[in-house]
Amino acid sequence: MEKLYDSYDRLHDYVRLSITDRCNLRCVYCMPKEGLPFFPTDRVLSQDEIVQLIENFAAMGVSKVRITGGEPLLRTDVVEIVRRIKAVDGINDVSITTNGLFLAKLAKPLKEAGLDRLNISLDTFKADRYKKITRGGNIQQVLDGIAVASKLHFKKIKLNIVLIKGQNDDEVLDFLHYTKDHDVNARFIEFMPIGNSLKTWQKEYVGLKNVFDTCKDNGLAYHPIVLRGNGPSDNYQIEGYEGSFGLIHPISSKFCENCNRLRITADGYVKACLYWNEEIDIRSAIGDPVAFRKLIQKALDNKPLNHEMAMSETDRIIDKAPTWRHMSQIGG
């Protein structure tokens, strides 16, 4: 088996696969309030195309798949997609990133289909803030979904928390305390300038030093830990707490050095780097493994050493154009 390496000798064994660009929320850091039409149904990869695509990747050494969106649980065939992907020879870890609104209903069938891990977006514990950040979401549905999923013994449940200055950065302690009695990994994520105006990002970006400061100010002793999984987070556990917390800081501390992932958009493009505009249409080659591999290798050969999300804060020249897609169109 000839595995996938980029020009910097980074092994790629992980695919993040978006199965829809549609979402039942419009989170402020992911989608504009209006004016972003969803892809027509025939533009989105079918279930059979998805499975064949993953079979191609598995033959090239990919063993881990994360299903994303949009909101992946909006697809009525999501459980069957999970079941079929997990059945592919060589795929040993399947996870999903979801907003959790449908999780109370779908957590059990997803677990039975073979889902290993869950990432749930939850940027606040306050109902009014949640409604504002998500532009209309009901936080109780998410909390109910987390409660159901927590009883099903997934390998790991993670909460994704995008910190936004002036909106939720005062809730760090609440999330840290949540890990005391809940076996979850609360992951604080820096707000990224993807699909947002630069001016908005510069105003609302906040670094993650705040998390350590909060621990120190409240007498919370913590130590680094290693979590099995695919993410770029640095992970820690507070002494005596059941769960843990993680930091994902693409701006203040790049995670590119060990990048092992490729992103597949819902309409069948491969993006080797989250931030670059460059993408290659692989849909027409899904049925031809040889042609498929050539396109994937082309994407890897062009993959940059680092993204340049923080270019606005420096005098560096940008090597490539930033992505034109919003996060929901890439796959979160």
UniProtKB/Swiss-Prot annotation:
Cofactor note: Binds 2 [4Fe-4S] clusters. Binds 1 [4Fe-4S] cluster coordinated with 3 cysteines and an exchangeable S-adenosyl-L-methionine and 1 [4Fe-4S] cluster coordinated with 3 cysteines and the GTP-derived substrate.
Required co-factors: [4Fe-4S] cluster
Swiss-Prot/TrEMBL GO biological process terms: Mo-molybdopterin cofactor biosynthetic process
Catalysed reaction equations from the record: GTP + AH2 + S-adenosyl-L-methionine = (8S)-3',8-cyclo-7,8-dihydroguanosine 5'-triphosphate + 5'-deoxyadenosine + L-methionine + A + H(+)
UniProt: S-adenosyl-L-methionine binding residues: Y29, G70, S121, M192
Keywords: 4Fe-4S, GTP-binding, Iron, Iron-sulfur, Lyase, Metal-binding, Molybdenum cofactor biosynthesis, Nucleotide-binding, S-adenosyl-L-methionine
Enzyme class: lyase
Superkingdom classification of source: Bacteria
GO terms assigned for molecular function: 4 iron, 4 sulfur cluster binding; cyclic pyranopterin monophosphate synthase activity; GTP 3',8'-cyclase activity; GTP binding; metal ion binding; S-adenosyl-L-methionine binding
EC number(s) from the headed UniProt entry: 4.1.99.22
Binding site for [4Fe-4S] cluster 1: C23, C27, C30
Residue intervals of the Radical SAM core domain: 7-221
Cited Pfam families: Fer4_12, Mob_synth_C, Radical_SAM
Keyword 4Fe-4S (UniProt): yes
Keyword presence, Iron-sulfur: yes
Residues that coordinate or bind [4Fe-4S] cluster 2: C256, C259, C273
Family annotation (InterPro entries): Aldolase_TIM, Elp3/MiaA/NifB-like_rSAM, MoaA, MoaA_NifB_PqqE_Fe-S-bd_CS, MoaA_twitch, MoCo_biosynth_MoaA/MoaC, rSAM
Stored SUPFAM superfamilies: Radical SAM enzymes
Record: residues binding GTP: R16, R66, T97, K158, R261, L262, R263
Role summary: Catalyzes the cyclization of GTP to (8S)-3',8-cyclo-7,8-dihydroguanosine 5'-triphosphate.
Similarity comment text for this entry: Belongs to the radical SAM superfamily. MoaA family.
Subunit structure comment from the entry: Monomer and homodimer.
Record protein name field: GTP 3',8-cyclase
